[in-house]
């Protein structure tokens, strides 16, 4: 598919990810990346849990955050649910990490749900960065509360 065949105009939206009323977001340096000047963790939280949907890869070999977020939205065929927060890290993709990566993604949902005050299934997780390295869960234990305080 060639994107040039579509007549789509993309416009920047003032306010970024929090342009929609009722959403807060914070980005911090949590330590996923070595450079302390680079933000590497973000938390997006609606004022109250809200309907959410996701579109995910159909690749059988998808990363742990994709598998966990898909499950939290009701599985591969449903793709929608109630969302109370989105946890995003950069510097480590948590991909090709097997059961350890899945456990980390699930524990990230647990940590975020305790901080936000919701069910773990209401948290989505996303990771980008180096593939094949184990993501340190202890970084989330400090990052999530710090980002929540910064909202």
Task: Kindly give the residue locations of the regions a language model identified.
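Glycine-rich, mobile lid/loop segments that gate access to catalytic sites or pores
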Residues: 106-107, 111-151
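Short, ordered loop/turn segments at secondary-structure junctions
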Residues: 48, 91-93, 128-130
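Short coil/turn connectors at secondary-structure junctions
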Residues: 37-40, 62-63, 78-85, 118-122
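Short acidic, glycine/serine/threonine-rich loops at helix termini
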Residues: 55, 98-101, 134-140
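Glycine-rich oxoanion-binding loops at beta->alpha junctions
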Residues: 50-79
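Short beta-strand segments
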Residues: 44-45, 87-89, 125-127
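N-terminal amphipathic/basic leader segments beginning at the initiator methionine
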Residues: 1-57, 61
């Amino acid at each position: 598919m060639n994107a040039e065949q579509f007549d789509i105009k993309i416009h920047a939206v003032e306010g970024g990810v929090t342009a929609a009323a009722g959403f807060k977001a914070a980005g911090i340096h949590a330590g996923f990346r070595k450079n302390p000047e680079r933000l590497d963790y973000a938390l997006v939280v609606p004022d109250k849990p809200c309907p959410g949907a996701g579109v995910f890869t159909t690749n059988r070999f998808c990363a742990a955050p994709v598998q966990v977020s898909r499950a939290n939205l009701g599985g591969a065929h449903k793709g929608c649910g109630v969302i109370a927060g989105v946890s995003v890290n950069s510097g480590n993709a948590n991909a090709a990490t097997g059961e350890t990566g899945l456990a980390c993604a699930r524990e990230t949902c647990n940590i975020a749900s305790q901080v936000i005050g919701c069910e773990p299934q209401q948290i989505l997780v996303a990771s980008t960065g180096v593939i094949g390295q184990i993501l340190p869960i202890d970084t989330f234990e400090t990052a999530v509360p710090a980002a929540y305080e910064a909202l």
